[in-house]
Amino acid sequence: MTDIAGDLHNSATVYPERVPAIDRLAPSVRPSQRAVMRQKWRDLLFVHWPIRPEAVRPLVPPQVELDLFDGKAYVGLVPFTMTGVRPVGLPAVPGVSSFHETNVRTYVRLANCDPGVWFFNLEAASAIAVRLARRLFYLPYHYARMFLEHEPTSQANEPTSILYAGTRHWPGPLPASYAIRAQPSGPIQPAASGSLEHFLVERYILFTIRNKLLYQGRVHHTPYPLQPARVLSLDETLLDAAGIDRPETPPLAHFASGVNVDVFPLRRV
């Protein structure tokens, strides 16, 4: 992705938000075409920071616009576990179909539709998944060693905390690692339409670039069973490896126990 950045991202234009013109519920409707993959996403932690639009505009291609909420762009760090990853019609393969994953993202859209995700980088603890995703979905995957641990609590009424950690091995840039300890607590419910939480997590479209051509991918799942979370500790260099200066403001965090996901083929935009 970095070799594209130099000749595609010269414009620093920040586009105004046009939220009223965007249907943010339409992408959650299941696409009519046949899914190509099925997978389960578990123990998702969404960690977000508001950021100045001009700080991330040069890092995304000119074919998309930044998707803003109240005039702010957001960058996210999202670790989770994938299980049951398989092509439609084939069984999952033990030792291959389950692995940890983490992504660094922002939110983009087309001129007045299709609010989606732009991935700066994605880490996966499966070398096979990394190679396939880079080849088939044109996504900037990296192989990383990662682990996720549900930590016991010292008091009966205290919510469980979860430790997410990982270190990138290849390809670069290096170093790139993270260690996040978070504590989910509070009511579990889908994000309300029109809320910041809905804007951040209910994303069913991704965009990616290959040979300067823009592609769009779709996923489908039920709304996340979302829960507030508290970040107890955070040490990471993934944002820096993506060319992003992490904002100094405390992050906004949410947790979801998981959803079952259908993945649809890429198409040219």
Label the predicted regions.
Residues 20-25, 93-105, 148-154:
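Short, surface-exposed, charge-dense and proline/glycine-enriched linear segments
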Residues 73-124:
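Extended, compositionally biased
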Residues 2-88, 238-239, 244-269:
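Hydrophobic, proline/glycine-rich low-complexity stretches
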